[in-house]
Amino acid sequence: MFGKAGIAGLMKQAQQMQENMKKAQEELAKVEVEGQSGAGMVKVTMTCSHDVKRVAIDDSVLEDAKEDKEMLEDLIAAAFNDAVRKVEATTQERMSGFTNGLNLPAGMKFPF
């Protein structure tokens, strides 16, 4: 089916793709996205490797939090979830070149 030259070529392509993927993942780890909730009153800054860098809470929310702790918790969770969705979208967009031609099932996230 494949001669030695064909297999060697496939192996070289696979190795090159692996190196390119590693570089792309290293670059993505430096990219930051910001998730928000409450019209920007709570912000979560996260890298595309899911490391949270900052959480910013508007002073007005803190004043209300004394009376409504659950509201503050909900705002933080919503901002965090917004950041995660942005990380996934950014990662998918930047990694799409690697998935072309791989025939991955619909909904499969990459990198795995």
UniProtKB/Swiss-Prot annotation:
InterPro entries: YbaB-like_sf, YbaB/EbfC. GO terms for cellular component: bacterial nucleoid; cytosol. It is found in: Cytoplasm, Nucleoid. SUPFAM superfamilies: YbaB-like (SSF82607). One of its GO terms (molecular function) is DNA binding. It holds the Pfam family YbaB_DNA_bd. It comes from the Bacteria. The keyword Thylakoid does not apply. Keywords: Cytoplasm, DNA-binding. Belongs to the YbaB/EbfC family. Homodimer. Binds to DNA and alters its conformation. May be involved in regulation of gene expression, nucleoid organization and DNA protection. NCBIfam families: DNA_YbaB_EbfC (TIGR00103). This is Nucleoid-associated protein CV_1611. It comes from Chromobacterium violaceum (strain ATCC 12472 / DSM 30191 / JCM 1249 / CCUG 213 / NBRC 12614 / NCIMB 9131 / NCTC 9757 / MK).
